[in-house]
Amino acid sequence: MTTTELVALLHLASPALPIGAFSYSQGLEAALDANLIHDADSARNWIASGLTDVLAHGELPFLAHQLARWQAHDAPALAAENAWFVASRESSELRRETEQMGWSLAQLCASLEWGDAARRATLASLQPIALPTAFAYAAAAHDAGADAVLAAYAFGWVENQTAAALKAVPLGQLAGQRIIVALRDAIDAAVRRALATPADAVNTFAPQLGILSARHETQYSRLFRS
């Protein structure tokens, strides 16, 4: 990996990326309301479970296959798989989340003219567009390798979940850093598992997350949009 490619992935994983990630907790706030999270240890366990039991089986392998589709510019496969991922979201909040963040990242890619004209046209045709599809596009535009792309995506997810826990539990900054450090090896394992997952084995089944997300829609007091 070149330094330029590394910097591009750091950019995509940055919390400063203007796609609204800070406004979503992906069920963490509902888990807190259900008393599944109540301190630093339970927050770490929740985030670790989401990484190894949900992301590693669904979003990460999906991202890897979308990256390959963008590299080959297989527009029909991109459209079909993107539509499948959007349909796989188990609540209206989770669907709006991936659509809003995907749209924001796609608009950023277009504004910065990342990728060639033909691929940008395909990107614009994907409506609605899921976040992993847009992330894969941005990564492909910078010629980044799949393992590094998945690691950047997973780290960004862990960091955002930790930031949500800091606000909602609440936790101190040091507790948050301990969570991130504790999950380094889990990120590596999740990436390796995702890279070994064939396209027909991608699995987004997460009933507890779906139920909590649906409950969050009517939760009395909320900081986050999911």
Curated annotation (Swiss-Prot):
Taxonomic superkingdom: Bacteria
Cleavable signal peptide: none
Molecular-function annotations in GO: nickel cation binding
This protein's UniProt keywords: Chaperone, Cytoplasm, Nickel insertion
GO cellular component, one term: cytoplasm
Pfam families hit by this protein: UreF
The keyword Transcription is annotated on this UniProt entry: no
Record localization: Cytoplasm
Family: Belongs to the UreF family.
Subunit structure comment from the entry: UreD, UreF and UreG form a complex that acts as a GTP-hydrolysis-dependent molecular chaperone, activating the urease apoprotein by helping to assemble the nickel containing metallocenter of UreC. The UreE protein probably delivers the nickel.
Biological role stated in the UniProt entry: Required for maturation of urease via the functional incorporation of the urease nickel metallocenter.
Protein name, UniProt field: Urease accessory protein UreF
